[in-house]
Amino acid sequence: MFKVVICDDERIIREGLKQIIPWGDYHFNTIYTAKDGVEALSLIQQHQPELVITDIRMPRKNGVDLLNDIAHLDCNVIILSSYDDFEYMKAGIQHHVLDYLLKPVDHAQLEVILGRLVRTLLEQQSQNGRSLASCHDAFQPLLKVEYDDYYVNQIVDQIKQSYQTKVTVSDLIQHIDVSESYAMRTFKDHVGITIVDYLNRYRILQSLQLLDRHYKHYEIADKVGFSEYKMFSYHFKKYLQMSPSDYCKQAK
């Protein structure tokens, strides 16, 4: 669901953080690594991650310069530092950062920070989604937070976690102990629409939050789980009665 860029010139540190931290537990499903600020800036501009973890002292472009370059972006930052420059960094950097961590990184401490961050991100995402959904009739079925059926809630949660992938109904119900026919029937009874319909509406809803972030429309289609742009465009028109381009013009 979320993305992180880990930037450190020491390979053992950046790869260690990538491999040791259970990122999936904190809803981070895409982890990028960079060996300096130049690589990190390119990744950040391309993928717009929710979190950047960066060292301060690196070749080519250091962490301070990187922070200056991304100050206008909406991303959270965790700074890594050695003992020698830790106090200087806290006093001298004027950017708002999520937290500072001394090397060697305390993985337990990092996970505490991630836990706090993901709660904030999920709440922001939920609020944004509810705000957008309330403005369009097509998204009304997505507004309900919880249903009185365990299996339906499990399927909805799975959709929200995996909508960005080329997921199928079988994929969505593989972790619950019921047949596909029972799951589909129960979902329709409680939600009023099919699982596939809910998935596609949710994908289009999420796409609205990306349309003003300077992505190409085919990039947005891929980011919200559509294998082809024409399928994204078809469902967009189906639910909103206009094309993505017309929606952007109307929103200006």
UniProtKB/Swiss-Prot annotation:
<feature type="DNA-binding region" description="H-T-H motif">
    <location>
        <begin position="170"/>
        <end position="191"/>
    </location>
</feature>
<dbReference type="InterPro" id="IPR009057">
    <property type="entry name" value="Homeodomain-like_sf"/>
</dbReference>
<feature type="modified residue" description="4-aspartylphosphate">
    <location>
        <position position="55"/>
    </location>
</feature>
<keyword id="KW-0963">Cytoplasm</keyword>
<keyword id="KW-0804">Transcription</keyword>
<dbReference type="GO" id="GO:0000160">
    <property type="term" value="P:phosphorelay signal transduction system"/>
</dbReference>
<dbReference type="InterPro" id="IPR001789">
    <property type="entry name" value="Sig_transdc_resp-reg_receiver"/>
</dbReference>
<keyword id="KW-0238">DNA-binding</keyword>
<dbReference type="GO" id="GO:0003700">
    <property type="term" value="F:DNA-binding transcription factor activity"/>
</dbReference>
<dbReference type="InterPro" id="IPR051552">
    <property type="entry name" value="HptR"/>
</dbReference>
<dbReference type="GO" id="GO:0043565">
    <property type="term" value="F:sequence-specific DNA binding"/>
</dbReference>
<feature type="domain" description="HTH araC/xylS-type">
    <location>
        <begin position="153"/>
        <end position="250"/>
    </location>
</feature>
<dbReference type="Pfam" id="PF12833">
    <property type="entry name" value="HTH_18"/>
</dbReference>
<keyword id="KW-0902">Two-component regulatory system</keyword>
<dbReference type="InterPro" id="IPR018060">
    <property type="entry name" value="HTH_AraC"/>
</dbReference>
<keyword id="KW-0805">Transcription regulation</keyword>
<dbReference type="GO" id="GO:0005737">
    <property type="term" value="C:cytoplasm"/>
</dbReference>
<protein>
    <recommendedName>
        <fullName>Transcriptional regulatory protein HptR</fullName>
    </recommendedName>
</protein>
<feature type="DNA-binding region" description="H-T-H motif">
    <location>
        <begin position="217"/>
        <end position="240"/>
    </location>
</feature>
<dbReference type="InterPro" id="IPR011006">
    <property type="entry name" value="CheY-like_superfamily"/>
</dbReference>
<keyword id="KW-0597">Phosphoprotein</keyword>
<dbReference type="Pfam" id="PF00072">
    <property type="entry name" value="Response_reg"/>
</dbReference>
<comment type="function">
    <text>Member of the two-component regulatory system HptS/HptR that regulates genes involved in hexose phosphate transport system in response to changes in extracellular phosphate sources. Activates uhpT expression to facilitate glucose-6-phosphate/G6P utilization by directly binding to its promoter. Antagonizes CcpA-dependent transcription of a subset of CcpA-regulated genes involved in antibiotic susceptibility.</text>
</comment>
<feature type="domain" description="Response regulatory">
    <location>
        <begin position="3"/>
        <end position="118"/>
    </location>
</feature>
